[in-house]
Each structure stands twice: as C-alpha cells, then as structure tokens.
C-alpha cells in the first residue's frame, strides 16, 4: 500500500515466514541475495579480505583464485546456509552446532591444526573482538554451559525475537569453538528466526561496532543490540518486499483482521496467520479509527497524502 511500510520487529508472522522459507529453499532471487550478502558480511565482520564482487564470483563460478582460506570460508558459508535450510525444522543441538562449524572450516588451514580442534569444542581460551576483547567460557566448561543454554531455551517453547538475540549473546559468550563462533552463531540466529516465525536478517559489516558493543553491554543495556538487529530485520524485510514476498498481503486481506494494539508509530493487528505490525512513519492512529484495520489503513494513507 502506498504511504505505509510493513515491518515485522520480531512479531509472529507465520504466513509470510512460510513464504520466506519456501523462497529460500526453492533457490529464488531472495536465496541468491541472502547467500551472497550473508557470506560476504558475516565473513567480513570476522576479518575476511574478500570484496563483494569476489564473493559473487565464488558463488556464481566457484572461483577460488583469491586468498585460499578466505575463498574457502566464503564457499563453505554458502554450504553452511544450505545445511541450515535442510535442517531448519530440526531442533538445535550440540551435534548440529559442531556440524555447522565443521562445514564452515572444511578444507581451510584451521581444519588440521590441533589448536583449533575443528570437529570439536575449543581446547584453548579465546575472546570476542581484537580490541577491548572480553573473556569467554573456559574450554573445560563449554559442554556444561551449552547443555544448560539449550535446555533453558528449549523449555521456553516458541521463542520471541528477544529470546533469539539473548540466546545469541549467551552462545557468543561461551564461544565454544576454536574459530568461526560469530559466523556459526549468526547462522543459528537465522535458523531460529525461521523456526519461530520472526523475520531473519543479515548483519551488515558496517554495523559491526554496534553489534560488538551490544554483545558486551547486554547485561546493562539490551537496547544497544536489540536496536542494531531490529534495524537489520527492517533491511531484510525491505529486500523481501523488493522480491514481492509480501505482495498478497494487501489492504483487502488485512481489512478483515482485528486491531489489538496501537501507539504513535504502529498498528498491531491479528490475523489467522499470526500477529502483524504496520508502521506508518509516526502517524498517530486515533481512537475512532480502531474499529477495523481497513479504516486505520485508509486513515494512514490519507494523512500521508495531505
């Protein structure tokens, strides 16, 4: 609808999420965009020197003529994403985490280096970030802490977006592997978003500093990381809109659904497929406009055209 923007800030949106999952599994344009950008940005955050064009070259032509470890990790990230899609409906386990990390490091110089213990958990202490690095779980405690983490979140049932982010913080603070923890953890977040009907996202390298600050300050100010990742969600939702993933969710369909909440920035309404959040760029939805979503949408459109 002209004059409105649909975003999904962690709400359950089962119908649209089914579409996103199907688009990715079917290797459509959204799949290609996600593969290239996810591999490029997630590896770049961890120090890869590959350009975006080189990442595309590896994806399209399997060209590994650049720095071998960087090229292999880009190629492996594509394979890791495919593995995640193949197992998206399976519960997360320690064994799956290990398999994810093994796929990422396969064929690299790390694979046969006993210091990195690829195929198992870390054997020496590590940290997050190169500058102002903060400590992580000791190697001897990794399995115990992972067991506790998995049990805690499995007991929650359906996870909210904040639950998924909290799980990621806990996983990164454990830092269970010798290398590749950030990329493995971000792939787990993508999987958990698809599993729990939350819009997934690709963390952009430009926001690396905000991401690391959010991880470090989570206990004191959750909004640092939440706001950073909610912004990434908005970017991915916009990409989905460009590929017409949400094209059938127009005013005619939404007009039949019940508004359950509203404030100065959004209308939250309920459908048979879950909760939707319609954002209208700071347009206030008045009390008299809450009878049905059709009136609210027409009001937003009218206000933005005046």
Provide a role label for each language-model segment.
Residues 1-179, 183-306:
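FIC/Doc superfamily catalytic core
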């Amino acid at each position: 609808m002209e004059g409105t923007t649909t975003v999904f800030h962690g709400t359950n949106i089962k119908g649209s999420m089914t579409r996103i999952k199907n688009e990715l599994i079917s290797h459509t344009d959204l799949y290609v965009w996600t593969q290239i950008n996810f591999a490029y940005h997630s590896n770049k955050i961890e120090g890869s020197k590959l350009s975006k064009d080189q990442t595309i070259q590896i994806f399209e032509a399997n060209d590994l003529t650049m720095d071998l470890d960087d090229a292999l990790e880009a190629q492996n990230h594509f394979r890791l994403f495919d593995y995640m899609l193949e197992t998206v409906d399976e519960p997360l386990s320690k064994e799956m985490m290990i398999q994810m990390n093994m796929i990422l490091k396969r064929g690299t110089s790390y694979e046969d280096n006993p210091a990195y213990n690829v195929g198992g958990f870390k054997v020496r202490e590590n940290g997050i970030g190169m500058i102002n690095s903060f400590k992580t779980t000791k190697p001897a405690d990794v399995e115990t802490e992972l067991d506790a983490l998995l049990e805690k979140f499995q007991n929650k049932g359906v996870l909210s977006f904040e639950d998924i982010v909290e799980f990621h913080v806990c996983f990164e603070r454990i830092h269970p592997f010798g290398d590749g923890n950030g990329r493995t953890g971000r792939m787990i977040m993508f999987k958990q978003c698809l599993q729990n009907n939350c819009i997934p996202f690709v963390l952009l390298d430009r926001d690396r500093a905000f991401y690391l600050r959010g991880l470090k300050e989570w206990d004191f100010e959750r909004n640092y990381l939440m706001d950073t990742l909610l912004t990434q969600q908005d970017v991915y939702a916009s990409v989905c809109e460009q590929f017409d993933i949400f094209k059938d969710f127009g005013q005619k369909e939404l007009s039949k659904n019940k508004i359950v909440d509203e404030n100065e920035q959004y209308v939250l309404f309920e459908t048979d497929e879950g909760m939707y959040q319609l954002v209208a760029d700071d347009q206030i939805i008045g009390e008299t406009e809450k009878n049905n979503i059709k009136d609210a949408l027409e009001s937003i459109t009218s206000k933005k055209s005046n």
